[in-house]
């Protein structure tokens, strides 16, 4: 499975996580790692760009929901 995950600034206080490919049980750890790195750096205002995602399974959805819960704890 091929996936690309990139980050970039998306405004003065926000960062975008651009994902391309398929998010499944094999690729979701990469997405989770990227998001968690931003959260660990204190970046809580995230935009997750899924325009390039062709498929997402329940594992991928779980990663996104987990990230949402983490950033909401910090009013992100």
Question: How should these model regions be labeled?
Answer:
Residues 22-76:
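Amphipathic alpha-helical interaction surfaces in cytosolic regulatory modules
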